[in-house]
């Protein structure tokens, strides 16, 4: 049976290796130290449990309570804590309704909406239609994510709306991609040694960059398949077509 490899293409245009998640933890620590007197709101992917853990670690270190907003964020954090994947110190987590009982400099809000989704919590805060959180001048708002290709305009809109409310928005050096860069893509192709390469997950230019790496590593052009949505690829023990 020939090996067929479907490989993530999102960062196929980026040289080098993806940086360690630990670098974000150091950045959080610096931001918390520099913004001791403001409320901190952090938007990130609900699925990134390790990122949430690093936020909680910094919050605990600097004496802040942590509230969570956004259905997916609440669900993931609850499940991760229950299963032991997330370590939350006692009395650190508070309900969002309790935010008003603490000074701004003593709280952190972890929220959904890092991609500018119109109905996500942060977008509703930016548009002044969130029922429980009102953006205040001098709030420090961190986008711990990069815009997924195609979401740049929506994210920029939310950042502008937050800035117009007087908030300080930080979006540089507070995210490490969860996707492989070129050297990791080369590594996985070298380890698996597939006969057929099927670049996936990305726009066409990302798939094409991935295909270029596969070809460079010796996979014949006719064995590399760049597929569009709706294309059918037939795979058998002997061939792919």
Sequence positions of predicted segments:
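Short, small-residue-biased leader/transition segments that mark boundaries at the very start
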Residues: 1-2
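Active-site loop-to-helix "anion-binding N-cap" substructures in soluble metabolic enzymes
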Residues: 9
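Hard-cation-handling environments
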Residues: 14-144, 148-241
